[in-house]
């Protein structure tokens, strides 16, 4: 089991800018499903639109890895669901996370987006996996 260290709490308490650079902490915590750290970071001003070196946001990574509660939190905090490539929805679909797909669609993701063939395949795959 991957666990994030306690350091974000210590850094924030000592005045560190947790949004500096790529904000690896919120990205990694979202990817590995550490809800409490993600919530703490958001409550203390972390950038929910941070992008890692591969172009993924916290919402992308939590959707890809099936971390529903983190996805829900990020959506509630107005993380961008609609991107030019519909990547977040594709990642959730490809990995069979129907509950996350439903949440994303209910909050504005468009499954008909430009007749995106890869999205259609991903949605079919998600249904098969569920």
UniProtKB/Swiss-Prot annotation:
SMART domains tied to this protein: ANK (SM00248)
Keyword flag Repeat: yes
SUPFAM superfamilies: Ankyrin repeat (SSF48403)
Membrane spanning residue stretches: none
Keyword Repeat in record: yes
InterPro entries xref list: Ankyrin_rpt (IPR002110), Ankyrin_rpt-contain_sf (IPR036770)
Keywords carried by this UniProt record: ANK repeat, Repeat
Pfam families linked: Ank (PF00023), Ank_2 (PF12796)
ANK repeat ranges per the UniProt record: 21-50, 54-83, 85-113
Annotated PANTHER family: ANKYRIN REPEAT PROTEIN, GH09064P
Name the UniProt record assigns to this protein: Putative ankyrin repeat protein R886
Organism: Acanthamoeba polyphaga mimivirus (APMV)
